[in-house]
Amino acid sequence: RQRQMCIRDRYIGELYMGHLRYSTTGKSGMSYVHPFLRRNNWRSRNLLLCGNFNMTNVDQIFNTVVSQGQHPRIYSDTFIILEQLGHALDMEHDRLYREYRDKAADGNGLARLIEDNINVDNILRDQARLWDGGFVICGMTGSGDMFALRDSKGIRPAFYYHDDEIVVVASERPVIQTVLNVGVDDVKELTPGSALIVGKNGGISVDDILGEGENRRCSFERIYFSRGSDKDIYKERKALGENVVPDLLEAVGHDLDNTVFSFIPNTAEVAFYGMMEGLEARLAKQKADAIKALDASAADYDRRLAEILNKRLRQEKVAIKDIKLRTFIAEGASRNDLAAHVYDVTYGVVRETDNLVVIDDSIVRGTTLKQSIIRMLDRLNPKKIVVVSSSPQVRYPDCYGIDMSRMGEFIAFKAAIELLKDRGMQSVIDETYAECLRQLELPMDEMENAVKRIYAPFTDREISRKMAEMLTPAGTRAEVEIVYQSIDGLHRAITSCPGDWYFSGDYPTPGGNRLVDKAFVNYYEGNADKR
């Protein structure tokens, strides 16, 4: 009867695990789909693994696994960690086998004793200390134990909820709220360095595995990846939009009468609301000052007062996006082709004397801007196009789970390199390469980010101007300017997640400095596909 139920009901188990992880290797295919499975005839030795992560020291972990006598078939962080934790599970299994082999009546009884007494802490504690990276790693044994472990600096997000009937862990809070219909205070953040462990008997604990380190929660999660429906993220994205108002006003000469404001769908919409609120506040002050300056006894007082009160910001839905397509997470080979077919525009809302301001959540590679957005916006014949980024300039690669690992992909980096060449400063590029090679000879915990030298000679605005020049397609009629969020503005908006290595180059772990130096060496040596 139990077998018939399992056949009839596909999802009949008590534990479910999966991850909608887009490949951070720049590739796709079934071999990259989580979870990964380590099989064994002993039920308690089976292990499933999935996670939101990348490790920066896969070679070190690989060498540790090999030193234990293993010979892994695949060299990837997920597979190596699966084998590492699988070996630790085997050791825990053997410990319990020795302890209970004389106390069990038969093999099945011994297997049950082992399953009932597996200590997940023993599996995680020593192994996880070898990991350098940002991670939330979830695992499940064949006997029914489950765990979710978060890195000690909180780089990758994790939230959980439990009651008498269910335990759930996810990377985002609002999805738990929506699916289970629970309040925001019912969903807890998994403490960095801790593991949520659910035993086969239903017991739940949050155990300190690595200790909580310095807070380096990832700010880019909040800007782009996470759902904007989260209570805190919604406020943060609005604040990001408001913080760019002074610089965008300067870009349009404070001419609100001849400026149309819009956004690049879809993740920038909330930042757009914040930007408009900031502009409304400034317009309200302008109105108040203008009213105070009026002569109430003048014959045209009523007309002039009405003109002031009727002033409105011109906001329109100018860009239209196919909601099914996201160019940021597309594979490198298809990104350019995809970018040209994602957007359309609304005609008839922009005059030839207008500035057109559009805000986007971030400008990383600039592919979509050059291949599609600027071309489309220029068809509306504005005098000037101002593209505003709610995030700062993305200057450095990520190595903790977001697919931004090649140095030469970043438009900010390309712009800095071009500026160095324009000004006869090739020596800075050569010296940076030499310093990166020197850094890579040091122990990992002594390495520094040598790539900061590339940006040091220039101001943010100089780099932004060069980016605008490089991203403006040939034949564009409008003047194009790019305005970026400042790093200070980022931190004022997102106070709880100070991890800003993409923008500042200040990596949260030693492995980050190693990989950024390695990324520059690959770029300099012409190995564009290496990560």
Describe the residue ranges of each PLM region:
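Phosphate/ATP-binding catalytic cores across multiple sugar-kinase/actin-like superfamilies
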Residues: 130-133, 237-257, 270, 275-278, ...
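Amphipathic alpha-helical
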Residues: 99-118, 279-289, 297-298, 304-318
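Extended, hydrophobic alpha-helical segments in both membrane/secreted and soluble proteins
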Residues: 261, 268-275, 279, 315, ...
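Active-site proximal loops enriched in glycine and acidic residues that flank catalytic Cys/His/Asp
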Residues: 139, 150-151, 171-173, 200, ...
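Terminal amphipathic helices with adjacent charged low-complexity linkers/tails
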Residues: 203-217, 263-267, 271-297
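Conserved short alpha-helical segments that host acidic/polar catalytic motifs at enzyme active sites
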Residues: 1-4, 8-191, 197-260, 264-265
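PRPP-dependent phosphoribosyltransferase catalytic core
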Residues: 127-128, 143-145, 150, 162, ...
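Short glycine-rich phosphate-binding loop at a beta-alpha junction
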Residues: 254-267, 386, 480-485
